Amino acid sequence: VKEVLTEYELTVDSYEQVRERPMDNELQEKYYSGKKSNHTFKSQMIILPDDQDIVDVIAGELGPKSDITLFRENRERFDAKQKFKGDLAYVGEDLIETPIKKQKKRELNIEQKESNKKFSQARIFVEHRIHSVKIFRVIQERFRLNSKKYEQVMLTICGLVRLRIKALILPEKRHPISLF
């Protein structure tokens, strides 16, 4: 499977979901995200180009963990030659192509802006897929279930989304006794 995926440039993005505040003070500190001003889980999704399928999902990581750290911890799942597209949160990673960042006190020229626009048009599909996962209320709002079940719930919902986009086609079972 890894060799087949190297033909594609996969798209990667991360997002946070608010969770119940842990009782333990040390856990509270680990899960507190200053960005969201709440205790959060962080998840990362990797999809095929043109929104064809969800390739990989990492769920239930600590909220304040950076996107690039999350990617670096899990990149051994893919071939060393695999290429990715990501947003500015992934700047500095050799395997991930990112948009051109504006320099301090300088504007981007027209070619750079056009390049970023084309890049964003190709990368927007991962945002659409994250939105289709967040349609489910359990992922959209505060996660109130047991925190140990977060990954299981997240993977189940991703399976339902794959079924909805017809990326996961189950074989049709036929009953041995038919009326015809």
Can you say where each PLM-predicted feature lies in the sequence?
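Short, well-ordered secondary-structure "scaffold" segments embedded in the functional core
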Residues: 1-180
